[in-house]
A protein has these predicted regions:
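Bacterial N-terminal signal peptides
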Residues: 2-12
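Short, low-complexity N-terminal intrinsically disordered segments enriched in polar/charged residues
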Residues: 12-35
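Bimodal feature
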Residues: 31, 36-40, 57, 82, ...
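Short solvent-exposed beta->alpha transition segments
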Residues: 24, 40-87
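Exposed beta-sheet edge and beta->alpha loop/turn motif
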Residues: 81-140
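Generic anion/oxyanion-binding catalytic loop in active/binding sites
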Residues: 6, 31, 48
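Compositionally biased non-globular segments, especially hydrophobic aliphatic-rich helices
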Residues: 9, 16, 132-134
Length: 140
């Protein structure tokens, strides 16, 4: 019985090892990207379509504005790891110096064992669309 349990645990560990390696690599990329320091290093991990839209100037301005409004990111906790045939989505709860807790989604494309950021977004998960806020105000 003990042998059977050991085999089952070993087999499940082997099956999930690939996602663990992928996740580790992607989290390192997220850390480098959101450090907001060296655009030239970050472009190595960006999909060409994202690199075309997110120029060095826009990247630097994004972090200047974020630091001014939110402060630096102090902590991020992985909440969801979604796996698709052609990539992954990592969703975090991100805490900032000025107290805000925002959601951070990073979309990766996987090609030949290499990962590149295709898109990302930082948003307030508690924010409501204006129409929803107006409807709630009318009901009161």
């Amino acid at each position: 019985m003990l042998f059977l349990m050991a085999v089952m645990v070993s087999f499940s560990a082997i099956c999930f090892a690939s996602h663990g390696t992928d996740l580790d690599a992607e989290e390192k990329i997220v850390d480098q990207f959101f450090a907001g320091k060296d655009y030239n290093k970050v472009t190595a991990f960006m999909d060409p379509s994202l690199a075309k839209d997110l120029t060095a100037e826009r990247y630097n301005n994004m972090f200047t504005e974020m630091n001014k409004d939110l402060g630096k990111m102090t902590e991020k906790n992985l909440r969801v790891y979604q796996v698709f045939d052609d990539g992954h989505v990592l969703s975090y709860a991100a805490k900032f110096e000025k107290g805000a807790v925002l959601a951070l989604d990073v979309v990766f494309k996987a090609e030949k064992g290499k990962f590149s950021i295709v898109n990302f977004r930082i948003f307030d998960p508690t924010a409501q669309a204006p129409a929803q806020a107006d409807n709630k105000a009318e009901k009161k």
